[in-house]
Amino acid sequence: MKTLLLTLLVVTIVCLDLGYTLECHNQQSSQTPTTTGCSGGETNCYKKRWRDHRGYRTERGCGCPSVQTAIEINCCTTDRCNN
């Protein structure tokens, strides 16, 4: 009986996805909102905003890019927080 319970426990652990994947928005500027699952090590979502000859541009995705001049970057750590 103990062997059966142990076997069921092992099968359950193997079959379940115990990992957590952060989900971030990844659309650009005026595109329809979409999301993506980030790679295993990613713990941040970002929203990058800047102005060019077409007006304000927005980029979203996984990770947290380094700071750049004249570009507003917001990083966050919860699912779909970069809307």
Swiss-Prot record:
The uppermost taxa in this organism's lineage are: Eukaryota, Metazoa, Chordata, Craniata, Vertebrata
* UniProt GO MF annotations: acetylcholine receptor inhibitor activity; ion channel regulator activity; toxin activity
Q: Name one Pfam family in it.
A: Toxin_cobra-type
Localization, per the record, is:
Secreted
Additional facts recorded: Accounts for approximately 9% of N.atra crude venom.
Q: Which GO terms describe its cellular component?
A: extracellular region
What is stated as this protein's family in its record? Belongs to the three-finger toxin family. Short-chain subfamily. Type I alpha-neurotoxin sub-subfamily.
| Disulfide bond residue pairs | 24-45, 38-62, 64-75, 76-81
Query: This protein is called what?
Result: Alpha-elapitoxin-Na1a
Any signal peptide, and if so, which residues? 1-21
Source organism (scientific name)? Naja atra
Tissue expression, as annotated, is:
Expressed by the venom gland.
Its principal location?
A: secreted
The protein's matches in PROSITE patterns, at most eight in alphabetical order, are given as: SNAKE_TOXIN
The entry summarizes how activity is regulated as: In vitro, its neurotoxicity is neutralized by both the specific Chinese N.atra monovalent antivenom and, interestingly, the Australian polyvalent snake antivenom.
